Amino acid sequence: MLSALLALPAATWATAGPEGADGGARLSICYNYGCASEGSVHVRGPTLRRIGERLAAARNAAEERERLAGAVGGLYRVAATQTAVAADRAGNLLDGGADGRMDCIDHSTSTTRLLQLLEARGALRFHRVVEPARRTRLILQHFSAVIEVLSVAERIDRLPPGQALAGCNCTEDGLVIGGIGEADGDDRPGQRYVVDSWFVDNGEPAVVLPLAEWLNGGGPNVQ
């Protein structure tokens, strides 16, 4: 089911509806476990612009991930004003069968859609959105949205026209684009991280972890 849901084109998930005149976007959020229910959510243009401005202030991939965790939480708060997902709590046991509860399929599907919306709006400069990941422990399995660190060349490609040259420090060694080639600590192009909103209550920042750590069981101890 998850692969079928994610096979839909991004435009199906994040297109401007009748209210799109404000620069906003409309997308579907899954809930009630296994994407049994879906609710249409309109994110206003000013909200998307504020999120974009905050993400644009990130100086490297690590800072973008930190800001992205909060952005995902904020978008779920928006969804909570228009759908039943305000009832969602961390994990599954605390949901108590409430309408609006979300399991990991709901979260991985919906969070991927939220991330793709931000990516389509040019808000991600250091990462791309990739397919969700699955981990299996004994008879249990768990899914999460995933992002991947971009190379410097790919980051430059994402700059608006003219911005790369405007920020260029031209030297004999080549081009250094301000804010694009800064050191990212241990980050390497292609490195993957989960953005897992299942671990938290509705509206709280998502948990962002290296994919390898998550696959090994990393993350808060919730059920």
List PLM regions with ranges.
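Second-shell loop/turn segments in exported
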Residues: 37-38, 54-65, 93-106
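Extracellular/mature segments of secreted proteins
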Residues: 38-45, 112-115, 177-178
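Hydrophobic/aromatic-rich core segments of domains that either
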Residues: 116-206, 212
